[in-house]
Structures are given as structure tokens and as C-alpha cells.
From Swiss-Prot:
Belongs to the small heat shock protein (HSP20) family. Homodimer. Forms homomultimers of about 100-150 subunits at optimal growth temperatures. Conformation changes to oligomers at high temperatures or high ionic concentrations. The decrease in size of the multimers is accompanied by an increase in chaperone activity. The keyword Cytoplasm applies. PANTHER family: PTHR47062, SMALL HEAT SHOCK PROTEIN IBPB (PTHR47062:SF2). InterPro entries: A-crystallin/Hsp20_dom, ACD_IbpA/B, HSP20-like_chaperone, HSP20_IbpB. Residues 25-136 form the sHSP domain. GO terms for cellular component: cytoplasm. This is Small heat shock protein IbpB.
Amino acid sequence: MRNYDLSPLLRQWIGFDKLASSMGGQEPQGFPPYNIEKSDDNHYRISLALAGFKQSELDIEVEGPRLTVRGKPTPSEKQVEYLHQGLVCKEFALTFTLAEHLQVSEAQFENGLLHIDLVRQVPEALQPQRIAIGTTPGLEAK
């Protein structure tokens, strides 16, 4: 019997909490490092660590359910010989699959962190509705 670890795939899906939380596993390795935060059932935040990037070198695109973040640093004119290179500033593209009705509300870039805020906006017609339970006086008397 084979066991497949699907957690690296599920971590790219925002808003599918029950599915993602039911599958534990190791954190995916990759660039850039990021966090996915949930503040309540309708608000999420993706934070990417992008030290060395400028705001003009970043691009955020939403196409259908896919949120793609791209970064392309401008090449340095100065040639540098590194004795140790621990900071990475390379081209990347990172794609997240968003759950239904989840939309990007805003994005901010400050102190080397790109924050993308997401909000779930379910149409009122699709939201659960509470039905009041009443009594019928005529039926109780019989």
C-alpha cells in the first residue's frame, strides 16, 4: 500500500481549511517563503518574505480562482564576489488556488514583506438563512 503526502499541494489552496487541516505533513520547501494566516472564517492573509525586492519588481495577478505572485529583480550592474550568500533574490512565480467567493481585497509591500489580504464575499442568496418557527393557534385547540 502506498501513502501519498498531499499536504504540499493543499497548502497552495486558500479557503479550503477543513480539507487542509485534515491532512498534516511537512512544510513545502521553496522560494519565496510565505505564511498563510486566517483571522476569521472570511478573512485571510498571505505574507511573502521578499527581502531585496523593490515594489516595482513585483506583480500580482488574479485569473479565475488562481492568484499568481511574480517577482523579477532588476539585474545588478555591479559584479559581486560572495564569500557567503545566504540571501536569495531571484526570479519567481508562486500560484495559489483560491476557494469559491474568495477575493483579493488589498496588497501592501513594506519592510521586505508583501501582504495580500483576502476576503470571502458570499452572495446573500447563497448564505445560510435562519427560518423562524411559529405555532398555529388553530391546530393546538383540536
